[in-house]
Swiss-Prot record:
Family, as annotated: Belongs to the UPF0725 (EMB2204) family.
Pfam families, A to Z: protein_MS5
Biased composition (Acidic residues): 1-17
Name this protein carries in UniProt: UPF0725 protein At4g28920
Superkingdom: Eukaryota
Membrane spanning stretches: none
InterPro entries: MS5
Region Disordered, annotated ranges: 1-24
Length: 292
C-alpha cells in the first residue's frame, strides 16, 4: 500500500501534539479535547447548542435516563447539547460519542451540566439490530489530573458476569398470543397510566424507530409483583406503536413492532439497550403474529 493509500488513523501524530492530546483526554475523560487532525477523539462542530442531530439527542437522553435510574429523587431532562466528540477507534460496525449536555432536574428546577459516553453498534439481521450502551452517565465534575481515565477499560468496561444469562445472547422472538397465554405470570402488560408516568418508554420506542429508519418478557420471579417488572434493572419489552409521521399507501399510519432488551450491570453510568424493530401490518400488534 502506498503512502497515498494510508488513512489518517495510520499516520502518527506530532509528538508534542500527542502529548497535549493525551493530557486532555486523561484530564477530561475525552469530553474536552481540542481538534487534532490525526487523533482518535475529535470534536464535532455545531452551529449552535440546538444544531445536534436526532441520534445524538437520543443518546444524550439515554445517558440522563441511566442516571435517573441510579439516583433516586432525580429527574434530569435534556435542555440542549452544546458539544459532543466522536471516537474513531477503528471499529467499522460501531460509533462512540462523548456528549456534553445541559439538563434540568424537574424535581427542584436545578440546572446542571451532564456528560455521557455512549456507543452504538449494529449487526446484520432480518430486520435491523441495534445495540446502544452507556459507559459514563454523570454530572460534569472539575477537569484536571485524576485516576479515572476512560482509556482504562477496567474502570468503564461492562461487568458481563453481573448480567443474568437470560438477558444475553440472541433476542427472543416476538411474543405471540399463545406464548403470552401460556406464561402470563412471567409478563406484565403495560397500562396506559404506565406510559403516561414513565417517559422513558417513549425513549425506548424512539430508539427502536431510529434503528428501523437507519437499518432498513421480563424473567419470572416469585418475589416480584407484575408491576415492579416494568422498572426492573433487566427487562425485555415487547412494544407495538405507530409512527406519527409515517403513512402506509392505504393512508393508514405505519405500525411497528419492537423488542427492546434492557440490561444493567450495577456499575454507575451503565445501561444497555438491544433493539430489534420492524414494520408490521396494520393488524399485527402484541399478541398476534410473529414478524415476517
Amino acid at each position: 500500500m502506498s503512502e497515498n493509500d494510508s488513512s489518517e488513523s495510520d499516520i502518527e501524530m506530532d509528538p508534542e501534539e500527542e502529548k497535549v492530546y493525551r493530557r486532555q483526554v486523561e484530564e477530561s475523560d475525552g469530553f474536552d479535547v481540542d481538534y487534532f487532525r490525526y487523533a482518535g477523539i475529535k470534536p464535532c462542530p455545531l452551529k449552535d447548542e440546538n444544531a445536534y442531530t436526532y441520534d445524538i439527542e437520543l443518546f444524550g437522553r439515554l445517558g440522563l435516563h441511566c442516571y435517573n435510574l441510579l439516583h433516586e429523587g432525580t429527574n434530569l431532562k435534556l435542555m440542549c447539547i452544546p458539544k459532543y466528540n466522536t471516537n474513531n477507534i477503528g471499529v467499522s460496525s460501531g460509533d462512540y460519542y462523548y456528549i456534553t449536555l445541559e439538563a434540568i432536574d424537574t424535581y427542584n428546577n436545578s440546572p446542571c451540566t451532564f456528560q455521557t459516553y455512549v456507543s452504538e453498534w449494529y449487526q446484520t439481521s432480518e430486520h435491523g439490530y441495534l445495540v446502544v450502551e452507556t459507559y459514563i452517565a454523570r454530572l460534569k465534575g472539575p477537569t484536571g489530573p485524576h485516576n479515572t481515565c476512560i482509556g482504562r477499560g477496567w474502570i468503564w468496561g461492562w461487568e458481563e458476569e453481573a448480567i443474568d444469562v437470560y438477558y444475553k445472547g440472541k433476542l427472543p422472538k416476538w411474543l405471540t398470543k399463545d406464548l403470552l397465554a401460556a406464561a402470563k405470570d412471567e409478563y406484565y402488560v403495560v397500562q396506559e397510566s404506565d406510559i403516561l408516568e414513565n417517559e422513558w418508554l417513549h425513549l425506548y420506542a424512539e430508539i427502536a424507530l431510529y434503528s428501523n429508519w437507519k437499518w432498513h418478557a421480563t424473567r419470572k420471579s416469585c418475589e416480584e409483583s407484575p408491576h415492579l417488572k416494568l422498572k426492573a434493572n433487566n427487562a425485555i419489552f415487547y412494544m407495538g406503536f405507530k409512527g406519527s409521521g409515517d403513512h402506509h399507501p392505504s393512508g393508514k399510519h405505519v405500525e411497528y413492532q419492537t423488542i427492546v432488551r434492557k440490561a444493567m450491570d450495577g456499575k454507575p453510568g451503565h445501561i444497555r439497550l438491544e433493539v430489534d424493530s420492524w414494520q408490521a401490518i396494520p393488524s399485527d400488534l402484541i399478541g398476534e403474529d410473529e414478524p415476517p
